Amino acid sequence: MFYAKGNYFSYTGANLKVGTLVYPAPEPGHAGLGTHLTLDLSGRIKFGPDVEWVDSPHDLAVNESRLAQTVREVKKYLPGLDETLMLPDYAGIRPKLGKQGAVAQGKGFVDFLIQKEEGYQGWINLLNIESPGLTSSLAIAEKVRMLLYT
């Protein structure tokens, strides 16, 4: 198991008039799906997550040295960003089956591993289901049903 920490930074300025989420297209060779722009429930802008490989799943402090890289990624789709208005916000851990794995080899993302667990009746593993896991939930349920009952 490998741990990909995602650092998030919030934007304190009022000069960006954004009313929707922004999910940039993934770039080949990157370990993640890009630095997103999301809005929290109060309408605050947040940028993240990035991908920082860490040894511990308990390392939840925002790595402030990642700010410059986040700014570079965000300016690709929001060139008017004032980086002086960005602050560390929070971090989370995403467990991964492989450290960069196929992504580092240029083969794309490895996700949606759905399989029976040999030796355990009725046990189905649903591994590495990331974005768009919720959108895919009905198709995932159908696959699980097929594995259990056919």
Language model segments and positions:
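Glycine-rich phosphate/pyrophosphate-binding beta-alpha loops
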Residues: E27-P28, W123-S137
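Short, hydrophobic/amphipathic alpha-helical packing segments
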Residues: L67-V71, L134, R145
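Repeat-unit-sized solenoid/scaffold elements
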Residues: V51-H58, L127-E130, A141
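Active-site substrate-recognition segment that forms the wall
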Residues: M1-G119
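Internal hydrophobic alpha-helix adjacent to the cofactor/substrate pocket in enzyme cavities
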Residues: L138-T150
